[in-house]
């Protein structure tokens, strides 16, 4: 079992290198601005003592006023984990793709795109993975029905 890192402590490290990247944090997670996602992800992956080299999973959540993309990260070397979140508007739901950093994000980003309609900018093959091409809408959205 991995040791979860305190979100507030990691947020301080992020802010020390990437000012204005952190939107909110607590003991369990860090929410960052979408424009900073790639820079923060690379920082978390390459910084000594953090080295989050493994992306466990990505999920999407449809809240009343926004979408949230949640990244569950693990450092195999240090046996610790972190929950990283990014929020985007429902009117223009898009965040940068992290496939260039964690190849395992490929199908997970496609799933979130297919079922929630969040666009992952820079994804090398962003197309539906469960629903057929031409399917109208995104079935896990609150407003689907």
Predicted feature locations:
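Terminal low-complexity/charged segments
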Residues: 1-145
């Amino acid at each position: 079992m991995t040791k979860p890192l305190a979100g507030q402590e990691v947020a301080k490290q992020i802010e020390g290198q990437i000012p204005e990247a952190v939107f909110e944090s607590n003991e369990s997670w860090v929410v960052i601005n979408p424009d900073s996602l790639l820079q923060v992800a690379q920082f978390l992956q390459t910084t000594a003592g953090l080295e989050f080299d493994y992306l466990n999973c990505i999920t999407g959540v449809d809240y009343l006023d926004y979408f949230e993309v949640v990244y569950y990260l693990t450092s195999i070397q240090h046996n610790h984990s972190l929950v990283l979140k990014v929020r985007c508007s429902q009117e223009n739901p898009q965040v940068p793709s992290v496939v260039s950093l964690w190849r395992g994000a490929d199908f997970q980003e496609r799933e979130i795109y297919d079922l929630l309609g969040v666009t992952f900018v820079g994804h090398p093959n962003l197309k539906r993975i469960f629903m057929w091409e031409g399917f109208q809408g995104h079935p896990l959205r609150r407003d689907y029905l």
